[in-house]
């Protein structure tokens, strides 16, 4: 997901999306441990999405506009 797309979400929607992405990352890690995960790059992409969401939430908290 692109940061420009995420900036259109409200804070509450971003927080919900963050929780969803964290759950998704946990599931991916379990699948990796069990040997069921075929596409390991999904872990990397999910971590990046989490970082983007946290960055946007922090920008709003500090009042930084982009």
From Swiss-Prot:
PROSITE patterns hit by this protein: RIBOSOMAL_L29
Superkingdom: Bacteria
SUPFAM superfamilies xrefs: Ribosomal protein L29 (L29p)
Gene Ontology biological-process annotations: translation
Keywords: Ribonucleoprotein, Ribosomal protein
GO CC annotations, alphabetized: cytosolic large ribosomal subunit
GO molecular function terms attached to this record: structural constituent of ribosome
Family from the record: Belongs to the universal ribosomal protein uL29 family.
The protein's name: Large ribosomal subunit protein uL29
Protein source organism: Thermotoga maritima (strain ATCC 43589 / DSM 3109 / JCM 10099 / NBRC 100826 / MSB8)
Gene that this polypeptide is encoded by: rpmC
